[in-house]
């Protein structure tokens, strides 16, 4: 028994000394649940036997009722741990895609521009390999030298006709040093290349709905996301590895689960009639200065259109994302994981495979705010002209040059980006 106790204590000490992000990655690893259940049952069996043995040795002075009480106390934490992990497993299976299928073939997607601008558009044709998961050797990251995520903020709901992706950010992470480049795409871009010459002549935030309305033209389980991925790939010149569509309710719940976010607010932002999580409405005010924002305040801050322009709102969105990346502690994320995933089950859609999650968690754990660059790809610096009616046309060649430079390891300023520490005062 002493030997078993020593093994248990040693194992517990080893686990306690592991980095939290490593434990979080293990918890999210497919197949880990079965092993943890076996370990949990084995430890429970040993503790129950030790309890019974101690009771039997002293049975002359204690009654059976005390054995039942002791066994209940012994069993409770194990049952709680099993229930908690089961909840995580079920939520992960509902939110994230099935494990990836390895493949080495790609199908090129050619894009062309269809709109008629008042200024000349970029004439280059862009060919991007279709998204696949390449076979990797042991120890190699599934996405290779860099991970490109398309983060979408949607405002679909019972009072909306379809999903409008009013927040669109390309987050590119270098595998070598976890340097992050965030490219924010204005929702009013027009005259951009479109996959396979499909008939489309609207602004960028209408692409997702177009894909939903024409599922036969696009691949995958989410034709809206597939359509938007194709457009974004043509604009940035890089393959999008995965997308994440976050309903704004999920954003609110996520900020709360992580304990809020702290950031400098350069100008007071108001949101009259803001709807709180409980459905009531208030006139929300986020005052100038360094502020601790909960989920409601953060959502009002990134969605308000009362002050400034759409581009100012995009700046706020990027800064909140950078602050969350910088401040989200792995330990807090581990504790908040059940509530996070519970909130995401019905409000997040993604094609990230479950077996890739541990690698992403490990990569993002190394984020350093000094290596985070931000830019809004809007006029005047990043546009090539205007569509009649005042719609900006993206300067595709320049955008692709900036994205390539960032992924090649150029400092943010050299790639045309602004360091988050400068842009957001973090």
Q: PLM features: what roles do these ranges have?
A:
Residues 28, 84-426:
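Non-catalytic, solvent-exposed segments at the cell envelope interface
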Residues 3-57:
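Membrane-embedded alpha-helical segments of integral membrane proteins
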Residues 3, 31-35, 62-66, 333, ...:
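Structural motif marking the loop-to-transmembrane transition
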Residues 60-90:
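Internal/C-terminal transmembrane anchor helices
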Residues 52, 56-59, 208, 236:
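Generic hydrophobic/packing signal
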Residues 20, 76-78, 395:
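Hydrophobic residues in alpha-helical membrane-spanning segments
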Residues 2-17, 176, 399-403, 414:
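Short intrinsically disordered, low-complexity coil segments enriched in acidic
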């Amino acid at each position: 028994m002493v030997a078993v106790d020593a093994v248990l204590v040693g194992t517990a000490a080893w686990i306690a000394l592991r980095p939290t992000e490593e434990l979080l990655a293990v918890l999210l690893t497919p197949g880990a649940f079965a092993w943890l259940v076996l370990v949990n049952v084995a430890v429970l069996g040993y503790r129950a036997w030790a309890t019974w043995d101690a009771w039997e040795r002293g049975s002359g002075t204690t009654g059976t009722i005390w054995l039942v009480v002791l066994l209940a106390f012994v069993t409770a934490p194990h049952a709680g741990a099993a229930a908690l992990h089961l909840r995580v497993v079920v939520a992960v299976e509902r939110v994230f895609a099935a494990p990836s299928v390895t493949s080495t073939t790609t199908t090129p997607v050619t894009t062309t521009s269809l709109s008629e601008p008042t200024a000349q558009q970029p004439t280059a044709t862009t060919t991007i390999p279709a998204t696949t998961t390449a076979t990797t050797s042991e120890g190699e990251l599934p996405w290779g030298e860099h991970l490109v995520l398309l983060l979408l903020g949607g405002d679909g709901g019972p009072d909306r006709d379809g999903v409008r992706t009013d927040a669109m950010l390309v987050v590119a992470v270098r595998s070598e040093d976890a340097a992050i480049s965030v490219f924010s795409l204005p929702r009013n871009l027009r005259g951009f290349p479109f996959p396979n010459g499909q008939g489309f002549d609207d602004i960028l935030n209408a692409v997702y709905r177009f894909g939903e309305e024409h599922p036969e033209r696009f691949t995958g389980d989410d034709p809206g996301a597939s359509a938007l991925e194709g457009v974004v790939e043509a604009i940035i010149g890089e393959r999008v590895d995965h997308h994440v569509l976050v309903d704004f309710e999920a954003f609110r719940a996520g900020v709360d689960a992580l304990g809020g976010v702290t950031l400098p607010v350069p100008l007071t932002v108001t949101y009259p009639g803001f709807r709180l999580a409980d459905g009531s409405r208030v006139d929300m005010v986020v005052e100038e200065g360094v502020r601790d924002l909960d989920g409601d305040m953060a959502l009002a801050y990134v969605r308000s259109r009362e002050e400034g322009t759409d581009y100012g709102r995009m700046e706020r969105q990027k800064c909140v994302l950078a602050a969350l990346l910088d401040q989200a502690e792995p330990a807090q994320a581990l504790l908040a994981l059940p509530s996070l995933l519970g909130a995401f089950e019905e409000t997040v859609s993604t094609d990230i495979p479950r077996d890739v999650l541990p690698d992403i968690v490990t990569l993002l754990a190394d984020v350093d705010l000094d290596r985070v660059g931000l830019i809004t790809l809007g006029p005047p610096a990043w546009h090539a002209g205007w569509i009649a009616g005042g719609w900006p046309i993206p300067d595709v060649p320049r955008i692709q040059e900036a994205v390539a430079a960032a992924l090649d390891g150029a400092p943010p300023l050299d790639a045309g980006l602004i360091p988050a520490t400068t842009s957001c005062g973090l």
